[in-house]
């Protein structure tokens, strides 16, 4: 049995709910779901350029968990971009 998820502190606003290739209806595309905590990890690690330790502390999780989230988010974004898939973004992320 896996451990229950820890409560994570999220503070990013998502500007839209879907990124997709131009000119292709979303109904014809495979979709990849980016979770709220993965979105936050991308924002803190790649946009705000925080260290993994600082970003993990900001989210209230361990540095190792932050690293897993960041790697998962990067993999999903890279897959969507390189394979022409739609990337679904979380709508429930709100600023604290």
Swiss-Prot record:
Pfam families per record: DUF134
First and last residue of the signal peptide: none
Highest rank taxon of the organism: Bacteria
Gene3D superfamilies: Winged helix-like DNA-binding domain superfamily/Winged helix DNA-binding domain
Entry's family note: Belongs to the UPF0251 family.
Record protein name field: UPF0251 protein Shal_3723
Species of provenance: Shewanella halifaxensis (strain HAW-EB4)
């Amino acid at each position: 049995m896996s451990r229950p998820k820890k409560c994570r502190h999220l503070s990013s606003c998502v500007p839209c709910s879907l990124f997709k290739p131009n000119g292709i209806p979303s109904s014809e595309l495979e979709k990849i779901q980016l979770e709220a905590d993965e979105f936050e990890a991308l924002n803190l690690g790649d946009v705000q350029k925080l260290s993994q330790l600082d970003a993990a502390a900001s989210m209230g999780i361990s540095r190792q968990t932050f690293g897993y989230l960041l790697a998962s988010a990067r993999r999903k974004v890279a897959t969507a971009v390189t394979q022409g898939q739609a990337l679904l973004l979380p709508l429930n992320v709100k600023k604290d």
